[in-house]
C-alpha cells in the first residue's frame, strides 16, 4: 500500500512540476456528499465461490465520501490533472445458505460483516476540441490505479480479496452555460472491454459564485466490474454530490 501511495504522489509531483508560466490556470476541485449502493454482486473465486449481494442480501448503510482533483489548464485547450477518490461501503446481515468466499466457508445464518473498498488514483489529459462562449466539449484519456478490497468477517472467521491494478479509461467533459451564471456539467471516465468495464460519471449544476469559485451539486454514478476465474464482481454506486471548484 505504501508503494502505491508513493507511486501516485510521484506522478502527481511530475504534474505539479510541469506547472510553469505556460499554464494559465490551476483548479482545485473538491467534492463531498452521500454515497449509497445500488447493486453490488460478488463471487470469489469467480469460478467456484458463492454469488451473493452486498446490497440486496446484506444491508449496506449510506455513508459520506470525498474526492479531490487538481487540474492544470494551459494553451487554452489542454488540461492535465490528478484525482484521489477513496470509496468505502460496509454491509451487515445474514445469508440463508453457506457462503464460500475467498477460500473460507461461512455457515448459513451467521451474522456477517462485509467491507467493500474501491479507492481510485488517476492521472488524466483532456483536449477541448470545441470551446465557445456557451459550450465546451473535450475528450482525452485517464490512467487509473484501482486499490480494491472485499472482505467478509463472521464468528472468528475472516477472508478477503485484494486487487491493485492499472486501468486505462476514456476521459470526457461537456460544459453548457445555459443561463447567466448557471451551467450544466457532464464529466467522467469510462471504458468497456471483454475483461470488464468501468464508468465514473458526474451530471451536475454549476453556479459561478465569483471569478474564483464555482459551486456544484449533482449526481454521480460509479459502475463496473470484472468476470474471470479469480473474481466476479459488479457494482453500482450512487453519489449525491456537492462541491466547489477553486480557480487560482
What are these regions (language model features)?
Residues 28, 54, 64-68, 119-123, ...:
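Hydrophobic, lipid-facing positions within transmembrane beta-strands of outer-membrane proteins
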Amino acid at each position: 500500500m505504501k508503494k502505491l501511495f508513493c507511486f501516485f504522489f510521484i506522478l502527481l509531483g511530475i504534474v505539479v512540476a510541469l506547472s510553469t508560466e505556460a499554464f494559465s490556470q490551476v483548479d482545485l476541485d473538491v467534492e463531498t456528499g452521500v454515497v449509497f449502493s445500488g447493486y453490488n454482486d460478488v463471487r470469489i473465486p469467480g469460478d467456484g465461490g458463492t454469488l451473493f449481494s452486498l446490497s440486496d442480501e446484506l444491508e449496506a448503510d449510506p455513508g459520506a465520501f470525498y474526492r479531490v482533483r487538481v487540474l492544470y489548464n494551459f494553451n487554452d485547450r489542454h488540461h492535465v490533472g490528478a484525482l484521489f477518490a477513496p470509496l468505502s461501503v460496509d454491509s451487515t446481515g445474514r445469508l440463508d445458505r453457506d457462503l464460500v468466499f475467498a477460500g473460507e466457508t461461512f455457515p448459513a445464518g451467521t451474522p456477517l460483516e462485509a467491507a467493500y473498498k474501491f479507492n481510485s488514483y488517476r492521472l488524466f489529459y483532456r483536449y477541448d476540441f470545441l470551446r465557445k462562449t456557451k459550450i465546451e466539449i473535450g475528450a482525452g484519456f485517464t490512467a487509473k490505479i484501482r486499490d480494491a478490497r472485499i472482505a467478509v468477517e463472521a464468528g472468528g472467521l475472516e477472508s478477503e480479496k485484494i486487487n491493485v491494478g492499472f486501468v486505462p479509461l476514456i476521459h470526457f467533459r461537456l460544459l453548457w452555460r445555459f443561463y447567466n451564471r448557471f451551467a450544466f456539467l457532464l464529466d467522467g471516465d469510462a471504458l468497456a472491454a471483454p475483461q470488464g468495464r468501468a464508468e465514473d460519471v458526474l451530471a451536475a449544476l454549476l453556479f459561478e459564485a465569483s471569478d474564483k469559485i464555482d459551486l456544484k451539486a449533482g449526481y454521480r454514478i460509479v459502475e463496473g466490474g470484472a468476470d474471470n476465474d479469480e473474481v466476479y464482481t459488479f457494482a453500482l454506486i450512487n453519489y449525491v454530490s456537492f462541491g466547489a471548484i477553486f480557480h487560482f
